[in-house]
């Protein structure tokens, strides 16, 4: 009888604790689970038929040999871009500031992700100090990841383009974020005379012109970066805006990047150096991919940045953190660029892919954002009243900034196969790393 009473009491305690944990963690509880690799310890696998092994499909769970193969492929792709004149580079000025770094606190599940999972770089910055600085241990991959390793930003580069737009406005190259697009190159397209903010907010009414998944323009078989913006403008000739819903796509931000080059004109290189060298103070060279020249060499604009710029940056882990810190300081200090960031936050629109309860929602940061504007995500579930800004790039190249508490998480990863709640959202929400 006493045993039954003890079991009953113990069950009540467990029920009470579980219920309270559930209430305390009704959202964003996260998971420490390391998603199992396909054929761990096996040979490398090449997905698809692309010549360069650059990026995995999001659904794949590659093993370490495959991750190594794709890192080699990225390096080969970088070299090919550079040798063919399809890369724009900004050299460091030698004025980078060294981060203050403290000893990593114990975080068993984060360590496990770095040793067996898909996170390749994890930086947690707290009030001027890197509190966690994590990369896989030497020897895990064919090439060790270090502070010189270049990563694609993917769509996080869209947010960097927006940050450059802010600088272009503050330096007078662009009159305001509401400036009508008056660009001869795009004068016969749907973008003509639209306010720039429409393009920044991804509600330019261009859903009928772009294949969302394949980044193809007007049914073209070629990827949009395999043609310059003269060719793209010809494909778009005669198009008109349809609707004002958010249509998230890759083509539009490259058009914005090239618009900045058009407005800055001969000062374009000067503008980029001001942003990356003088403001961000990069430590290593930063690159971005250029659209291929496909128009006639007799074209007046042939080869110029305004027909070739893109958001596809290649940057080191430390310099991506420097980008985030620069954004945070501008915002906090209410500089001209900081006020631009505040304005796009105020004018952000409802994000149509807010779905925190969806199955596997935790694999994507954007599932927890309620607002999108100026190529940033805002208003995160359970943190709506806080000034938090985030970026998200394919396969986990992400930034989240807590403007109120000076905390930043920057990640680079190999695959879409880890819990964004545990390693990003929770860290910003609670201000501490997972145990």
Predicted regions and their residues:
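Classical Sec-dependent N-terminal signal peptides that target proteins to the secretory pathway
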Residues: 1-26
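N-terminal leader/targeting segments and the immediately adjacent pre-domain N-terminus
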Residues: 22-145, 170, 174, 427-435
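Catalytic-site signature segments of enzymes, centered on catalytic residues
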Residues: 144-148, 211-293, 311
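Active-site-proximal alpha-helical segments within enzyme catalytic domains
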Residues: 252-259, 311-333, 397-413
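Active-site Gly/Thr loop motif
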Residues: 294-305, 348-409
């Amino acid at each position: 009888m006493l045993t039954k009473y003890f079991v009953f009491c113990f069950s009540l305690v467990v029920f009470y604790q579980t219920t309270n944990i559930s209430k305390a963690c009704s959202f964003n509880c996260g998971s420490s689970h390391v998603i199992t690799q396909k054929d761990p310890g096996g040979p490398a696998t090449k997905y698809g038929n692309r010549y360069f092994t650059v990026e995995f499909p999001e659904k794949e769970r590659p093993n370490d040999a495959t991750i190594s193969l794709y890192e080699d492929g990225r390096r080969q792709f970088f070299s090919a871009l550079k040798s063919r004149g399809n890369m724009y580079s900004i050299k460091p000025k030698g004025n980078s500031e060294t981060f203050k770094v403290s000893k990593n606190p114990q975080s068993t599940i984060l360590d496990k992700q770095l040793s067996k999972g898909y996170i390749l770089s994890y930086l947690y910055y707290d009030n001027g100090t890197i509190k966690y600085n994590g990369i896989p241990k030497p020897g895990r991959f064919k090439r060790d990841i270090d502070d010189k390793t270049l990563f694609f930003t993917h769509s996080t580069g869209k947010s960097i383009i927006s940050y450059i737009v802010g600088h272009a406005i503050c330096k007078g190259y662009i009159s305001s974020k509401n400036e009508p697009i008056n660009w001869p190159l795009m004068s016969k397209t749907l973008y003509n005379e639209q306010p720039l903010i429409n393009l920044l907010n991804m509600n330019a009414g261009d859903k009928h012109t772009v294949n969302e998944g394949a980044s193809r323009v007007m049914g073209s078989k070629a990827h949009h970066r395999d043609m310059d913006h003269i060719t793209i403008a010809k494909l778009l000739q005669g198009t008109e805006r349809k609707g004002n819903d958010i249509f998230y796509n890759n083509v539009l931000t490259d058009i914005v990047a090239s618009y900045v080059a058009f407005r800055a004109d001969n000062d374009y290189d000067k503008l980029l150096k001001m942003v990356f060298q003088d403001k961000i103070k990069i430590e290593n060279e930063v690159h971005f991919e250029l659209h291929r020249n496909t128009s006639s060499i007799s074209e007046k604009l042939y080869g110029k940045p305004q027909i070739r710029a893109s958001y596809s940056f290649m940057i080191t882990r430390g310099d991506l953190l420097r980008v985030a810190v620069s954004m945070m300081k501008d915002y906090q200090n209410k500089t001209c660029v900081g006020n631009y960031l505040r304005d796009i936050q105020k004018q952000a629109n409802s994000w149509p892919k807010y779905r925190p309860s969806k199955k596997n929602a935790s694999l994507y940061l954007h599932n927890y954002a309620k607002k999108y504007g100026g190529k940033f995500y805002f208003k995160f579930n359970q943190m709506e009243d806080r000034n938090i800004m985030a970026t998200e790039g394919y396969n986990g190249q992400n930034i989240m900034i807590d403007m109120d508490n000076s905390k930043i998480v920057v990640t680079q990863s190999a695959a879409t196969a880890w819990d964004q709640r545990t390693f990003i959202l929770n860290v910003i929400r609670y201000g501490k790393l997972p145990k």
